[in-house]
Amino acid sequence: MKTDFLVIGSGAAGLSFALKAAAHGHVTIVTKGEMNECNTNYAQGGICSVTYAPDTFEKHIHDTLVCGAGKCDPEAVELVVRRAPELIRDLIAWGTRFDKTPDGRFELNREGGHSEHRILHHEDLTGAEIERALVESVRKHPNITVLEHHFAIDLLTQHHLGEFVTRHTRGLTCFGAYVFNEETNEIETMLSRFTIVATGGCGNIYSSTSNPIVATGDGIAMCHRAKAITENMEFIQFHPTSLYHPAEKPNFLITEAMRGFGAILRLQNGEEFMDKYHPMKSLAPRDVVARAIYREMTRRGEDFVYLDVTHKDPDSVRSHFPNIYEKCLSIGIDITKDWIPVTPAAHYCCGGVRVDTNGQTSIKRLYALGETSCTGLHGANRLASNSLIEAVVYADQAARHTASLIDRTDFQEGIPDWDFEGTQHTEEMLMLIQSKREVQSIMSNYVGIVRSNLSLKRAMRRLSILFEETEELYNKTKPNRELCELRNMIAVAYLVIKQGREIKESVGCHYNIDYPKQ
């Protein structure tokens, strides 16, 4: 099949791009699960935008740069911060409902690392509200086709025309993707003028993550195999406060907005401890808080610390955090009376596929958006609630850029269909599940919040064995979702380890005990 715009992924980045691009051509969205099964849907806290005085663009820029620990791209920071208000208006026009005060002004939260209240939100379910509005708008649009349960396997380039390509090949171009239709078990060749990869993050390379089970790094892995450049993959952000409930996957997030509301981190003996680590205490940047919790837990041999909001007005707590209140109540915790057991969990990939200010990768006609991309906004550590606004700003940038090129961009002919010769259906499902767990174990044990040269070396050695075994199976097997996800998880884990070994310092989310000074 042919489509003007092939969008892979259905979170805020992919859907907002689709709504903009549909004015200039036909858009096909492929997503491996249901349309709302994405990281956006799990984002609780909110979305950043300078809205009222005394906040200013300069303050938001400063907070982002400080949190990014010297690794941000100032041009990307400036772009996102200054374009944010305009894109917030677009989200509202598509039907997003942000909370307001009784006098009709937007109710703004403050989270870790922010100097002002600038986070628009919908209760404690902001991502779900944005996703709802976008999904409804997309489903009504006559120029957008949505294909659920379609898994993009690989991107099409000159490699599929028989050419030898590397990351340095001039004119390397993307022509579309091979997509696995889970309903027919067929692999479809989808040709496009432009391909937009917006598949979200890779939290499931770790045992404990706030990400949904679909977050297996598919887009980053596909782009890497297609020879796109990736960067900053070592900067995996761990959210400091996921609900400690070992039986549940994914980890339920306790939003950072709760600490902005006044919640206090405590040890199991009731002692406050963040004042030992940062002047902003419980409102310190995420990497600082996550490492502090990790150190205190390790020192005491404990699995969690507490988050205490019992000193705040109960009615106010329930109205600000209704989802968290109901969730905790369902497991016997009344957050207006009881402390909440919390533990860090893998949350966000600050790196990804390198893109320019138009969202274009190092491969022509290939764009990466949202958590799949590395725009340079986040540097070594993402500022809370900067991700959703980055997604919609860069989606708009990419939509504008592709619209300017569409009239002189044609489909590539001569791409062969998928070759099934010599392959068979696998009956090794149990082995695939076990291999996924091995990847998660390697990453959690050796490439977590605190790392070392030895742990990274050991992780690479163990992952290499899994890589060889999985490639051998892949080459003789008809693709299925589980095998492709495992292959992608291994590819992304490799990038995290490799780039972690290359950086000879501790900075932001990457803390190596062999380079302790930050």
Show which residues each predicted segment covers:
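Glycine- and aromatic-enriched mobile tails/lids
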Residues: 1-3, 12, 20, 34-36, ...
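Core beta-strand elements of the Rossmann-like FAD/NAD(P) dinucleotide-binding domain
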Residues: 1-3, 185-194, 362-363
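N-terminal Rossmann-like FAD-binding beta1-loop-alpha1 element of flavoenzymes
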Residues: 5-29
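Conserved N-terminal glycine-rich FAD pyrophosphate-binding loop of Rossmann-like flavoproteins
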Residues: 33-65, 69, 237, 248, ...
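An anion/pyrophosphate-binding glycine-rich loop and adjacent beta-alpha core
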Residues: 35, 222, 228-335, 340, ...
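Short beta-strand to alpha-helix junction loop
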Residues: 72-85, 118-136, 147, 209-217, ...
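Conserved redox-cofactor binding core of oxidoreductases
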Residues: 93-186, 191, 198, 242-245
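FAD-site-proximal beta/loop scaffold in flavoenzymes
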Residues: 154-166, 171-184, 333-377
